[in-house]
Amino acid sequence: MITNNKPQVIIDYALPCMMAEKALKDSHNAVLEQDLDLAMTQAMEAVLQSRVLYTSLRHMKEQQQ
């Protein structure tokens, strides 16, 4: 039997996904309240969290191969 002693790294993709969703919702609510500065800040947070999500997914795909 061959064992792989390489430690397994668990990548959390769900948290940045949920954070991006929340930031988009908060951005939408800020627009409805006519707080465009907050809306823009939350939109940027959604972009940043989406990039973290993408990186996590890319890492998971590389580990799969």
Task: Please report, for each region that a protein language model flagged, where it lies by residue.
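Short intrinsically disordered terminal tails
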Residues: 1-5, 61-65
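Short, charge/polar-rich alpha-helical segments
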Residues: 2-14
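Short amphipathic alpha-helical heptad-repeat segments
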Residues: 12-23
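Short, charge-rich amphipathic interface segments used for partner binding and complex assembly
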Residues: 22-64
